[in-house]
């Protein structure tokens, strides 16, 4: 998980690779956080830049997939409240889900060239925000229609009708995060 890394210099990255190798572990998925659901162009650009940077880190670590997400409206400040509401939160006043999907799609499209150049596949996780449902994840992935943005399926994140939703995601799933 990127947020748990204490440093990002090359010697640290190579030490992580060495530790994984010595312990028989494959580094197969790099986990990051994005927040593209914002009317503020500067906020989206900051998250695009962060995503591009994380693609570079994944590449240096030899990791072929990187978990990405949409972000969320940010109108629910308390995580427990967000969970009580099953990840659903009110939109920012004056904005629509359609606008949010457009912002997310535009942002991921700006990351595709770097993902392809580095050979790191982005996997959009079924996480909170606009990726809370299989329909939301697939709306984004299918709109972009690139082999460099597919799906990371997280078994702990669908709160309703899990099997149907995983069945929908399966054809485009490149990575699974399994939880009990």
Predicted regions mapped to residue ranges:
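Hydrophobic faces of well-ordered beta-strands that scaffold small-molecule active sites
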Residues: 1, 27-32, 66-68, 122-124, ...
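N-terminal, post-signal-peptide region of Sec/Tat-exported proteins
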Residues: 1-14
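Short, solvent-exposed loop/turn segments at secondary-structure boundaries
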Residues: 5-8, 39-44, 164
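Glycine-/small-residue-rich active-site loops that bind phosphorylated ligands and cofactors
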Residues: 8, 129, 157-158
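Active-site acidic/histidine proton-transfer and metal-coordination neighborhood
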Residues: 13-14, 19-26, 37-150
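Active-site pre-Tyr helix/loop in NAD(P)-dependent dehydrogenases
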Residues: 33, 72, 158
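Gly/Pro-rich active-site loop or hairpin
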Residues: 134-138, 142, 148, 157-180
């Amino acid at each position: 998980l990127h947020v748990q890394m204490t440093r990002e210099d090359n010697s640290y990255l190579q030490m992580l690779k060495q530790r994984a190798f010595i312990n028989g572990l494959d580094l197969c998925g790099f986990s990051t956080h994005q927040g593209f659901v914002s009317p503020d162009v500067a906020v989206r650009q900051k998250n695009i830049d962060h995503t591009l940077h994380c693609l570079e880190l994944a590449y240096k670590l030899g990791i072929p997939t990187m978990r990405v997400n949409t972000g969320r409206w940010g109108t629910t400040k308390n995580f427990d409240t967000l969970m009580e509401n099953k990840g659903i939160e009110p939109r920012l006043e004056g904005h629509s889900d359609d606008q949010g999907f457009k912002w997310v799609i535009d942002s991921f499209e700006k990351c595709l060239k770097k993902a392809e150049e580095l050979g790191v596949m982005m996997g959009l996780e079924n996480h909170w925000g606009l990726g809370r449902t299989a329909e939301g994840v697939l709306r984004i992935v299918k709109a972009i229609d690139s082999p460099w943005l597919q799906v990371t399926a997280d078994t702990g994140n669908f709160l309703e009708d899990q099997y149907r939703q995983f069945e929908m995601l399966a054809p485009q799933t490149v990575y699974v995060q399994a939880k009990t």
